[in-house]
Every structure is written in structure tokens, then in C-alpha cells.
């Protein structure tokens, strides 16, 4: 994928999770990547990545740092976003097995199941073919990952587990300017998915 000549400013929600890895991947993919911990930092970015981590903890920290309502407002206004693992849960409209009191940002018309693939000891890797991504399947790392149980009519399914006991489970989706994966693309050296998102952000900026 061709990296855009301009450099979109992409934030990574830096409350918990694989922040450093996402920043490095976004930089390699052609973005001006910056950590976001405060509302004033959120206001300076063109798009946001919500990393893996623990979704209930990130929910609480976003509120504690005064980021929850600004996040909702920016997303409602059309800011592009990319959520990986816990980030997918935070972007989803509905969560099965949600923790008591857990809320989400609700911008993706999907139902996700928390920890669907099992516990930490059940972590695994798989090669996932992704719609729109050239170069063959993407090596995907699943760690206490969710999966998508239902999608709304405006949601495009980009990837499913191709084989094994979880074959057919939805693990990558897109709805407009919002992208989400159940796996951790930042934990491999393959930057294609981050480049795909950076290109999405650049295209949105041209509209």
C-alpha cells in the first residue's frame, strides 16, 4: 500500500495497553503518531487508535482523565478510529459478558463477546486474510481476545478466522471511518494494517 505524501496526525490513547508498539507501527506507516492522555491532546489529532489492554480499566481511566465525553464527541463528529482487542470492545455498541457498569463508545454497530477465545493461556496466532489488504494473509496475535457475534447492516466484515475450532469467527470489521480488530497487529513487524488505517485517515481528510 502506498503511504500518503501528507502525514496525518494520529493519536494513540495512552492510558493502558500497547501504546509504544502502536506509536512505532503508525510512524512506520507514515503517520505523525502521538500519545493522547488529555482532552487538549485529543483535540490536536486527525484520528485515534485505541490499543489493546483491559477494556474496563481503560473505560475507568478515560473517565478519570476527563477524556470520555470528548472522545464520544469526536467520534460522533466522524473522527476516524482504529481499535485493537480491548479497543474493539470500547468502540462496539453491544458487549456480551460485559463487566458490571461497563460502558462503551458505541460507534460500531456490532456485538462483541469479551475474552471469547479464552484466557491468557489460550493465546494464539493465526494467518488472517483481510479484505482490502494486499500481500496475502496477516499474521494475527490473539491475547484474551474478543470476537464479533453480530454485525449491523452498515458494517463490513474484513476478516474471519480461516480454520480450526474457531473457524468463521469475525475478527476484523470496518464501519465508515472506524476500523477494529480482535487481534493485536502492533505486535508483529507487518505494518500493512496500520498503513491501511493511515490511508483511511488521509482519504477522510480529503473529503
From Swiss-Prot:
Pfam families: SNO. It catalyses: aldehydo-D-ribose 5-phosphate + D-glyceraldehyde 3-phosphate + L-glutamine = pyridoxal 5'-phosphate + L-glutamate + phosphate + 3 H2O + H(+); L-glutamine + H2O = L-glutamate + NH4(+). The keyword Lyase applies. One of its GO terms (molecular function) is glutaminase activity. One of its GO terms (biological process) is pyridoxine metabolic process. Gene3D superfamilies: 3.40.50.880. Keywords: Glutamine amidotransferase, Hydrolase, Lyase, Pyridoxal phosphate. Pathway: Cofactor biosynthesis; pyridoxal 5'-phosphate biosynthesis. It comes from the Bacteria. The active site is at 85 (nucleophile), 184 (charge relay system), 186 (charge relay system). SUPFAM superfamilies: Class I glutamine amidotransferase-like. Its EC number is 4.3.3.6, 3.5.1.2. L-glutamine binds at residues 53-55, 114, 143-144. GO terms for cellular component: cytosol; glutaminase complex. NCBIfam families: PLP_synth_Pdx2 (TIGR03800). Catalyzes the hydrolysis of glutamine to glutamate and ammonia as part of the biosynthesis of pyridoxal 5'-phosphate. The resulting ammonia molecule is channeled to the active site of PdxS. Belongs to the glutaminase PdxT/SNO family. In the presence of PdxS, forms a dodecamer of heterodimers. Only shows activity in the heterodimer. This is Pyridoxal 5'-phosphate synthase subunit PdxT. It comes from Acidothermus cellulolyticus (strain ATCC 43068 / DSM 8971 / 11B). The lineage of its organism: Bacteria, Bacillati, Actinomycetota, Actinomycetes, Acidothermales.
Amino acid at each position: 500500500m502506498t503511504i500518503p505524501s501528507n502525514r496525518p496526525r494520529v493519536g494513540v490513547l495512552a492510558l493502558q495497553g500497547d501504546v509504544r508498539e502502536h506509536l512505532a507501527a503508525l510512524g512506520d506507516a507514515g503517520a505523525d503518531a502521538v500519545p493522547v492522555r488529555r482532552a487538549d491532546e485529543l483535540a490536536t489529532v486527525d484520528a485515534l487508535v485505541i490499543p489493546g489492554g483491559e477494556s474496563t480499566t481503560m473505560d475507568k481511566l478515560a473517565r478519570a482523565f476527563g477524556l470520555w465525553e470528548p472522545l464520544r464527541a469526536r467520534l460522533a463528529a466522524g473522527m476516524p478510529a482504529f481499535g485493537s482487542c480491548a479497543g474493539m470492545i470500547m468502540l462496539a455498541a453491544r458487549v456480551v459478558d460485559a463487566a458490571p457498569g461497563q460502558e462503551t463508545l458505541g460507534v460500531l454497530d456490532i456485538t462483541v463477546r469479551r475474552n471469547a477465545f479464552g484466557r491468557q493461556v489460550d493465546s494464539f496466532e493465526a494467518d488472517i486474510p483481510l479484505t482490502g489488504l494486499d500481500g496475502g494473509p496477516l499474521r494475527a496475535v490473539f491475547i484474551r481476545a474478543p470476537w464479533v457475534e453480530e454485525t449491523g447492516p452498515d458494517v463490513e466484515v474484513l476478516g474471519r478466522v480461516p480454520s480450526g475450532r474457531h473457524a468463521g469467527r469475525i475478527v476484523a470489521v470496518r464501519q465508515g471511518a472506524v476500523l477494529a480488530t480482535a487481534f493485536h497487529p502492533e505486535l508483529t513487524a507487518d505494518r500493512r494494517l496500520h498503513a491501511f488505517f493511515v490511508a483511511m485517515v488521509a482519504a477522510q481528510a480529503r473529503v
